[in-house]
């Protein structure tokens, strides 16, 4: 789905980037979504009372009748499905109940990214309400020592410390050999994952994953933390903590949904919306300290992506993600302050590392681009494993090709993060080469792998050949999908109110991209940023005589063109909150100048 990649771009464009180097301004292909059926639009206008523009935007999202509109704007809980529809849920609940009854020690285990650490925090906090903490602990693998997923070290930690049950979150679906090891030493596993399964499922007590072929759970796009939340719901049919306390944990789930860029539809959208409400009034000290006080009342998905996720991720990227979990579960304000200071410093270190490695990778790509290629593959053994995924995304912003960034692992193997373009399935491309890997996993848009060094040259040839044979024309250049052409007078209070109701935004429920044609700047063009990288200007709203502010991040190089020419403007709408007042501005996504 192109929305996945476009979402990343839209979020990144929303704020000033911190890079010292300059990205090439890449032109985008404008794809106008087909005009929806007039009869359906008219039917929606008469049934829900929105205007023509608003109704068109809804129909383009397949919200094409009163019932769907009601479910979208006022969900009644039917989208939060029965957890026992998920394969193995009953087994998982019964095994945990047995462990609690018998006084067994339970270890909550998770990946080191935001989805994994929020999942561990959520599960730990739920279990701590029903289990004495002396029977409970959590474990996050060290990215630099153990790598991704379930590790030998984690299993031996459990065995050596008397844990007979591990609940694994956001990992484990392909850990067949590791679960066999755990079984051989008497440690049971419950797996809660959302990644694509392999041909063979691990022999765990229970494997919860809505993407299992034999799973009849109706919603397939849960995050790893989301699968963990479903297990908590299942457990709560026995332990019955107040529902308000259970759903208070959705503040962590909202962070997971936003950070892992899963679909913002159905159950995810309902849970994200619920989670944002709890996040704005969260009682978790660590989260309160991460959120600027002035933003708290209006905290949205984009704020999670910018203000929380990078900091939570920084611990796992640069040091150890255990700090992120401790931050989210801490009930000690002094401890929470100390951890926040630590991860803010780690995030600053991560930013500096990101800048340097991205520049180094860009230098490599300049050499690679001398020969026509359909993919980008770069390698340097000195690059930090924790930031190569970010670097891959940066390279795509410049060169827009399926991209892998390799570095060296702890045991001399090569490890990589892969990122894709548009709807090109990079997981499938890697599957084509999987006989070369030690292990790999991921999604359509992003994946990771490890590989012996002597396989690298063959991999580059085979991956390039696969991309060349399978990539489609529309996947070779960045595209912007436009909902509607509008006039300045359409951008009024009623439309802004409607726009707010569409939130939370994310893949499959993107902010509408609109186009104004034949626009002229009204007054000045002001450059912004230390390097004059960004700009802002006004256009006139003729019916009110007021100006509408337009902001262009990384459009500073076009300041003279904006001053002198008419242009077509593709944009999304953003909100500013300041001292109780709300204003709106147009966030420029692309521009076409008229000669």
Where are these regions (language model features)?
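Hydrophobic helix-and-loop "lid/oligomerization" segment in the mid-to-C-terminal part
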Residues: 27, 34-165, 185-186, 236-458, ...
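Short alpha-helices
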Residues: 122, 200-241, 246-258
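Beta-strand/loop nucleic-acid-binding surfaces
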Residues: 545-560
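OB-fold/S1-family single-stranded nucleic acid-binding modules
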Residues: 579-595
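Accessory interdomain/linker segments of ATP-dependent helicases and helicase-like nucleic-acid enzymes
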Residues: 486-548
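Histidine/acidic-residue-rich, glycine-tolerant segments that coordinate divalent metal ions
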Residues: 169-222
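Short nucleic-acid-contacting surface segments enriched for D/E, G, S/T with interspersed K/R
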Residues: 556-570
